[in-house]
Amino acid sequence: MKAKEVSLVALFVALTSVGAQISVSIGPVPLTLQVFFVILAGLVLGPKLGFLSILIYDILGALGIPVFAGFSGGIAHILGPTGGYIIAFPIATFIAGLGRGKVRYLTSLMGLLVIYLIGWMWLARFVGFNKAFILGVLPFIVPDIVKAATAVIIAERLQGNT
């Protein structure tokens, strides 16, 4: 990897970590800017480097570095009720990064879908399927679509594709 790529990967690890701290509690799954930076990482860095940046974020958190929401970290967060969302982040980043041009909106939404599906199924192990959907998916649909669309617009501006 070139120095610029290493720097960009590190930047998105940091941005995602900061985004996790901008949080509003609305149940067991907090509303944060993590999803925004997860999608933006894929759009700006592409699927491979985006995946790497968010995988590093997940690994740092699993190792106990307080990068998750509420300045938390540790393997318990990966194994706990919201762990599925965290596990899904690198996959969503990869999918979002596959998009170019107008397809970016679609791949960003597909990335969100992956986060929802994995997170919902994981959370359902703790609270049941219906309650997991009500707590862990439904309240996030509109805010996350707005975040994903904003990420696409910002990525296009950063890359000069207006």
Curated annotation (Swiss-Prot):
Keyword Cell membrane among record annotations: yes
Membrane spanning residue stretches: 6-26, 59-79, 81-101, 109-129, 134-154
Keyword Transmembrane helix belongs to the record: yes
Single GO molecular function: biotin transmembrane transporter activity
Listed GO CC annotations: plasma membrane
Domain of life where this protein originates: Archaea
Places the protein is found: Cell membrane
Membrane topology designation: Multi-pass membrane protein
Pfam family of the protein (one): BioY
Keywords: Cell membrane, Membrane, Transmembrane, Transmembrane helix, Transport
Protein task: Probable biotin transporter.
Family: Belongs to the BioY family.
Protein's recorded name: Probable biotin transporter BioY
Organism of provenance: Pyrococcus horikoshii (strain ATCC 700860 / DSM 12428 / JCM 9974 / NBRC 100139 / OT-3)
Native organism taxonomy: Archaea, Methanobacteriati, Methanobacteriota, Thermococci, Thermococcales
Protein's gene: bioY
